[in-house]
């Protein structure tokens, strides 16, 4: 049986660059935050102002639990029941990942990667693109809080994320070149 301090011999590395690979790591990414309650940022949806005042306050001030019925189509949020000021008669309209719909029960649904192409519920908000990976990492039973941002802030966050990913790509490409693994 293996014991603490045992050393295991390894066969010659199949790829010579593996022997030369230095230890390195990346800092945790802010969009994969693992804090117990993550704040997800939203843009106002076309029907945000149709929410009554108490519902707008609750949407942005109360925590929401990710429901066990969540999947890759939509993430169901459980929290205070949200209500419209008056009923809306809507025709189906295009939706995208991150669209926050409000079905009749008052519990919002954030559309995810395998969302339908159209939806007929009020579109009260839209999760910004930068926070969509964070939503995808949340599990049923975890909580999220929601906050509104302006479009210019959402765009600045998207640009910052894109720049960070470009730097990572360049760094990995350079390291692979240095290690001779692109040959």
Residue ranges with predicted function:
Residues 1-183:
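Conserved "landmark" site that anchors the functional core of diverse proteins
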């Amino acid at each position: 049986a293996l014991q603490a301090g045992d050393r295991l011999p390894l066969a010659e590395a199949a790829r010579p660059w593996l022997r030369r690979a230095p230890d390195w790591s990346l800092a945790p990414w802010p969009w994969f935050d693992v804090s117990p309650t993550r704040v997800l940022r939203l843009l106002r949806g076309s029907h945000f102002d149709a929410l009554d005042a108490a519902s707008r306050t609750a949407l942005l001030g109360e925590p929401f639990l990710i429901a066990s019925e969540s999947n890759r189509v939509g993430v169901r949020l459980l929290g205070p029941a949200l209500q419209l000021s008056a009923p809306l008669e809507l025709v189906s309209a295009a939706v995208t990942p991150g669209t926050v719909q409000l079905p009749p029960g008052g519990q919002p649904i954030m559309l995810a990667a395998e969302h339908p192409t159209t939806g007929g519920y009020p579109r009260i908000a839209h999760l910004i693109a930068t926070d969509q990976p964070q939503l995808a990492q949340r599990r049923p039973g975890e909580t999220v809080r929601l906050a509104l941002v302006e479009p210019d802030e959402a765009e600045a966050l998207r640009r910052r994320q894109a720049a960070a990913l470009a730097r990572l790509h360049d760094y990995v490409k350079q390291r692979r070149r240095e290690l001779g693994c692109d040959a």
